[in-house]
């Protein structure tokens, strides 16, 4: 609220804003006891984008399962969430989204499953390996996702994500191996991963879906428009650093005539904008009638 007031756009922003919030018991230092709880409440302004339908976890038309994958590249087991749409069969050869942060994928799947059931988007498969830990001991997730911090760790994760994951997914679930029906997806540091991987392996991915990127274009993520994937960008005006970086990507792609789409929302660094924009990106990529 204070950020909205400081920009002098209070009424306009409030009418267009969407954000999640929650209530948690605080200790004497003002910190949530036991950590931050669920962000299970929603504010949606009267002029904000319409809320998309969502299915409950136990009411999915498709299926969401967890698999244990032994990765030679990572030298460890890594859990992978796999969403299969209703009616899937191994010979379906469906479009596939390779996503980061599989340990947090459920809210996205609820929206995608509903959108598929309502025929708002075509059936897709989602392959989402869990992220490395991000806790008081350090941010291992960022070391795997982003170039320029730990080259060996980043390279090992690239071999896992790009090579091992796609081979396993094609063999186990019959997902498409065609570039135009492969997408890579991530938010925040996951968006940086999507942009870096999409650039480095442009022959594999026809679409790069990157929301609220924290790393602007530059030396760490070089981008050449020649043969680049279509980039779907989204950021909220109330997440200043991430909005600035994502807007820089939009400007960079526009300047270099690299195909892209940038959606700007009145929102913070908030899950709600990401789960609502992903079905729209899928419709834009593979649907006949893009969602508004």
Model-flagged regions — what are they?
Residues 2-9, 13:
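Single conserved hydrophobic/aromatic residue that forms the stacking wall/gate
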Residues 110, 171, 178-228:
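Primarily recognizes the serine-hydrolase "nucleophile elbow" in alpha/beta-hydrolase
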Residues 11-72:
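The feature marks proteins involved in alpha-glucan
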Residues 81-84, 91-102:
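Short beta-strand element of the alpha/beta-hydrolase
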């Amino acid at each position: 609220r204070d950020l909205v007031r400081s920009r002098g756009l209070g009424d306009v922003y409030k009418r267009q804003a969407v954000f999640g919030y929650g209530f948690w018991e605080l200790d004497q230092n003002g910190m949530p006891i036991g950590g931050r709880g669920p962000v299970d409440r929603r504010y949606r302004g009267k002029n904000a984008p319409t809320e998309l339908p969502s299915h409950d976890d136990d009411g999915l038309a498709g299926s969401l399962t967890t698999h244990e994958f032994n990765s030679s590249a990572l030298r460890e087991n890594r859990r992978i969430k796999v969403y299969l749409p209703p009616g899937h069969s191994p010979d379906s050869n469906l479009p596939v989204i390779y996503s980061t942060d599989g340990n947090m994928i459920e809210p996205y799947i609820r929206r995608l499953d509903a959108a598929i059931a309502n025929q708002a988007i075509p059936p897709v498969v989602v392959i989402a390996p869990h992220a490395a830990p991000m806790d008081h001991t350090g941010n291992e997730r960022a070391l795997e996702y982003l170039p320029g911090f730990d080259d060996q760790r980043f390279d090992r994760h690239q071999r896992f994500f790009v090579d091992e994951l796609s081979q396993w997914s094609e063999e186990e679930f019959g997902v498409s191996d065609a570039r135009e029906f492969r997408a890579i997806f991530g938010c925040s540091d996951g968006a940086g991963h999507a942009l870096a991987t999409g650039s480095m392996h442009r022959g594999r991915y026809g679409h790069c879906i990157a929301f609220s990127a924290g790393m602007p274009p530059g030396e760490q993520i070089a981008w050449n428009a020649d043969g680049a994937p279509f980039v779907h960008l989204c950021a909220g005006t109330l997440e200043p650093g991430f909005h600035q970086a994502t807007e820089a990507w939009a400007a960079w792609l526009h300047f270099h005539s690299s195909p892209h789409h940038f959606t700007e929302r009145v929102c913070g660094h908030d899950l709600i904008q990401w789960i609502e924009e992903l079905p729209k990106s899928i419709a834009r990529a593979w649907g006949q009638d893009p969602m508004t």
